[in-house]
């Protein structure tokens, strides 16, 4: 991000937060230049960016003023999915979206990929090169089945931040959170079982269940506080549910952080009904609040919570470094790993361990939390400007994803196909439901570095939505 873009996003965030009100005069170009230690031309470029976004308006010989803006869209209401076990569909839509990822000319607003070009990742790339040059025998040999111990020790220390007390021996390294969740599900479930999920739910988890022949029951979920404990309890009383998949921290796709009281209530239900919790914490490190939120796993006393995570969202998906703390299922999951995915790549594990050990990881996370928070604020500004006023939009407490609910008559599955022909890709809401609900919703990735390309893409999405409403 250039200096003027950084300044523009900072000012946009202040406008979004109400620190600069409608009609209020903004600081002069000279005073902002002195305050932030940047050139006059940098401030002028930042103001021109905000003017293009229609956040500010210039007045001759008077300066810049905050523009009249649309009202803040409301947060989507509690979801109301079909509350009975169903077989998972939507694979064709997911496959179409995944295949489009290979087209580098497409604006990729559908992928939940972090910013992998952040300068704070440079120490990791240097360490990867060093590891390969100086540890050739280890790098080219077989890995330990549980993964490199030095990495497991660092992950155990990281997990202390979320309240989970584990040792290196409690952790199994995988090739990503998707692999962690897949192994966890296979260690517990069999074809014909029923698993409860939040609604909407990350499509990758549901497609894993589909491949295993497991049915899903979607549970109503509040976009600000998470899964309905009451609805979950009712489902547990009605159906032989084997387990529940939860993303309680910086949820994908809704962005909420489940309050601690609700996390403990869900764990209490799991204990009472003797079910397993599959906890996905892959976005937990990106929470806006500090210290980061606790995991459900941190309150687990009998090993029924299988905690899955990775560096895919906090660092980069290409590392293929994930982990699982499987509790009472440790031995079974080790066998599943040996039988199915076997060993991991030692080089990326060793580099990641050093990246954490030397403090680079925490510096990187602090920086990315700020950047993603500003990106979310700025993308929200753009969406408010270009989309119909009838929308609802989430207010994430971390991560980098936005969930937008459009008027009922908008079929985002059809709109997404049109946008793909225009070289813009979004994730239609229906792939986040086992039964194909949320066709009038979409998920947007806000991790991508701010640029005119993404602003223009959001403008074209808004125009396509308006056409769908006609």
UniProtKB/Swiss-Prot annotation:
User: TM segments?
Assistant: none
Residue span(s) of domain HTH gntR-type? 1-69
N6-(pyridoxal phosphate)lysine occurs at which residues? 313
Please give the coiled-coil regions recorded for this protein: none
Q: Gene3D superfamilies of this UniProt entry? A: Aspartate Aminotransferase, domain 1 (3.90.1150.10), Type I PLP-dependent aspartate aminotransferase-like (Major domain) (3.40.640.10), Winged helix-like DNA-binding domain superfamily/Winged helix DNA-binding domain (1.10.10.10)
One GO MF term attached to the UniProt entry: DNA-binding transcription factor activity
SMART domains per record: HTH_GNTR
Acyltransferase among the record's keywords?
no
Query: What CDD domains does this protein map onto?
Result: AAT_like, WHTH_GntR
Which processes are annotated in GO (biological process)?
A: alpha-amino acid metabolic process; biosynthetic process
Q: Which Pfam families match?
A: Aminotran_1_2, GntR
What's in the keyword line of the UniProt record? Aminotransferase, DNA-binding, Pyridoxal phosphate, Transcription, Transcription regulation, Transferase
Q: Which family does it belong to?
A: In the C-terminal section; belongs to the class-I pyridoxal-phosphate-dependent aminotransferase family.
For this protein, the record's PANTHER family field holds: HTH-TYPE TRANSCRIPTIONAL REGULATORY PROTEIN GABR, TRANSCRIPTIONAL REGULATORY PROTEIN
Indicate what this protein is called per its UniProt record: Uncharacterized HTH-type transcriptional regulator YjiR
To which species is this protein native? Escherichia coli (strain K12)
The uppermost taxa in this organism's lineage are:
Bacteria, Pseudomonadati, Pseudomonadota, Gammaproteobacteria, Enterobacterales
Gene symbol? yjiR
């Amino acid at each position: 991000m250039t200096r003027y873009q950084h300044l523009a996003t900072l000012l946009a965030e202040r406008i979004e937060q109400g620190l600069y009100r409608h009609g209020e005069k903004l600081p002069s170009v000279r005073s902002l230049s002195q305050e932030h230690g940047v050139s006059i031309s940098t401030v002028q470029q930042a103001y021109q960016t905000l003017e293009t976004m229609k956040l500010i308006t210039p007045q001759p010989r008077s300066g810049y003023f905050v523009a009249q803006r649309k009202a803040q869209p409301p947060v989507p209401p509690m979801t109301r999915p079909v509350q009975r076990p169903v077989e998972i569909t939507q694979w064709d839509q997911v496959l179409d979206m995944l295949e489009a990822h290979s087209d580098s000319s497409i604006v990729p607003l559908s992928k939940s990929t972090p910013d992998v070009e952040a300068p704070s990742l440079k120490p990791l790339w240097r360490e990867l090169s060093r590891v390969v040059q100086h540890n050739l025998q280890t790098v080219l040999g077989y890995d330990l089945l549980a993964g490199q111990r030095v990495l497991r020790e660092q992950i155990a220390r990281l997990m202390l931040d979320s309240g989970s007390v584990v040792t290196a021996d409690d952790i199994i390294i995988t090739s990503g959170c998707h692999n962690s969740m897949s192994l966890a599900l296979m260690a517990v479930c069999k074809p014909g079982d029923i698993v409860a999920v939040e609604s909407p739910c990350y499509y990758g988890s549901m497609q894993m269940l589909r491949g295993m022949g497991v049915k899903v029951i979607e549970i109503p979920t509040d976009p600000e506080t998470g899964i309905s404990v009451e609805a979950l309890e009712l489902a547990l009383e009605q159906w032989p549910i084997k387990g529940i998949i939860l993303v309680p921290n910086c949820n994908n796709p809704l962005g909420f952080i489940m309050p601690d009281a609700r996390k403990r209530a869900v764990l209490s239900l799991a204990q009472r009904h003797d079910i397993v919790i599959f906890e996905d914490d892959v976005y937990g490190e990106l929470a806006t609040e500090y210290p980061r939120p606790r995991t459900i796993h941190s309150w687990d006393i009998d090993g029924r919570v299988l905690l899955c995570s990775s560096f895919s969202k906090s660092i980069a998906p290409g590392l293929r470094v994930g982990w699982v703390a499987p509790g009472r299922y440790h031995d079974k999951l080790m066998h599943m790993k040996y039988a199915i995915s076997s060993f991991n790549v030692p080089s990326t594990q060793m580099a990641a361990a050093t990246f954490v050990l030397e403090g680079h990881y925490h510096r990187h996370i602090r920086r990315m939390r700020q950047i993603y928070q500003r990106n979310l604020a700025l993308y929200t500004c753009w969406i408010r400007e270009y989309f119909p006023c009838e929308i609802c939009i989430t207010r994430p407490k971390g991560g980098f994803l936005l969930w937008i609910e459009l008027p009922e008559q908008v079929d985002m599955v059809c709109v997404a196909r049109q946008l793909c022909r225009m070289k813009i890709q979004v994730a239609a809401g229906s792939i986040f439901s086992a039964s194909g609900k949320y066709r009038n919703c979409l998920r947007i990735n806000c991790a991508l570095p701010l640029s005119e390309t993404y602003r223009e893409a959001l403008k074209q999405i808004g125009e396509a939505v308006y056409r769908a409403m006609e």
